[in-house]
Amino acid sequence: MSATIKHINIKGIEVPIIFEEQKDLPILNLQLVFQNSGYIQDKDKSGLVNLSSSILNEGTKELGSSNFAQILDENAITIHSSNGFETFVIEISSLKEQSKKAVSLLNDLLKSPNFTQSSLDKIKTIQTGYLKRKENDFDFIAQNQLKALLFKDTALENPSSGTIESISKIELKDIENFLSKTISLNNLIIVAGGNFTQKEIETLIKPILENLKIGEKSEVKKIDFKSQKSEKTLQRDTEQAYIYFGSSFNIDSKDEENYKAKVASFILGGSGFGSRLMEEIRVKRGLAYSAYGNISINKTHTYFSGYLQTKNETAKEAQELVSKLVDEFVENGVTQEELTAAKNFLLGSEPLRNETLAQRLNKAFTLYYRGLDQDYSKKELEKIQNLKLEDLNNYIKSHKEINNLTFSIVRR
C-alpha cells in the first residue's frame, strides 16, 4: 500500500498528513516535520537550531533527562528531535500497544521542555567537546571550508554544528524563542505509518496538535549563489590531502528535466566504481582510494559537489584532473555505454528504494514537500527509460556553470 496525503483541520488550519497503513508491523512511526525551520534559521547564531533540537532530547523540566529517558526505555519508546537545513523534526517510534503513552509523553515534552540552565550547559559542553574533536578531522574541516567558500553570504555558509565561539554565545532565551516560533501548526507536516487506520492516527495525535499554537506561515526562500573558479588550501600535519569541490547547478527542485540531472550525476560521480571520476582518478591513475561527485537537489538550493583523498604529493595533479574531467563531461557528454549502464542500475535498483515503510514514507514526504505529484517517481523512471543520448548530452552541455569549481583543500 502506498502513502496517502490527507489533511486534518486543527484550529482552522489544514495540516497535511502523509500516511501509510502497514498491518504486518505493530508499530507507530510518527514524525512532526516543521518547514523552513532547520539551520537555515541560525542567522547570526550558528549552531542555534542544533542546540534547540538537542535540548528537546533532554526530557521535560519536571522529570529531567535521566528519568524521562528511563520511562522511554521501560516502554520501548523513542522520542528524538533533529534538524536538517530546511526542516526541524520530532520523531516518535513505539510498539502499537504503547502508542498512546508515547504520544502522551511527547505532549508532556512539548508543554514543558527542559528549559533549564543546567540542561543548556550540558548540551553546550557536549557540543563543544564534539567540535574540539573535529579540529583534527580533516574531512570535516575541508567540507566546512567548502561550504564557507561556495555559499558565502548565505544561510549555508556556516556549519549546522556551529563553532566553539558561536555556541558559547547562545543563551536559553534564544532557544526558547526559536522553538516557540518553530513549533506551530502553520508550518507542520505530519508523516505517519504503521498498523493504524487513517482515522486511528488522527485520533491518536489530535491531543498534541490541539496544544500547538497556530503560528505564522513561514515561506521557504531560494538561496541564490554563483560559484567561481577558486581554491583555498589549509596547511595541516596530515598524511593525505583532503580535496572537496563544488559548483552551482542551476535547476529548480520542481524542474521537469531533473531526471536528466539524476542520470548525469550518476554517470559523472555518483555510481562509485564505473563513474567517470572513479574510473579516471582511481582505476586508471591510482590517485585516490575513492572519488565521488553528486548533484544535490533541494527546495532552497541545488549544487554539484564531490570529494577525494590523495597523497600530498599528488594533490595538485588530482585537483587539475577533476577540473579537466568536469570540463570534458560538459563539452563531450556521455557515451551510449555509460547511459545504458546508468539506466540499468537506476531502473533495476528502484524496488530496493521502496522496501521499508520508512523509505516509502520518506519518499512520499520528499515529493509532497517539493510540490511534486505522488506518481512523480514512476513517471521519472519512464522518462529515464526513454532518455536518448543526444537529449542527455544537450542537457549536460547547457549547464556550463558546473565548470566553475571551487576547491577546498587540507594538506601538508
Region locations from a protein language model:
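N- or domain-start disorder-to-order transition segments that initiate the globular core
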Residues: 1-28
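Low-complexity, intrinsically disordered Gly/Pro/Thr-rich segments
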Residues: 388-398
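Short, conserved secondary-structure transition motifs
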Residues: 94, 129-134, 224-236, 345-353
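His/Glu-based metal-binding/catalytic segments typifying zinc-dependent metallopeptidases
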Residues: 22-38, 45-46, 217-274
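An aromatic/glycine/proline-enriched structural segment found at the starts
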Residues: 6, 152-161, 165, 185-252
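M16 family metallopeptidases and their MPP-like homologs
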Residues: 20, 25-54, 65-111, 141-165, ...
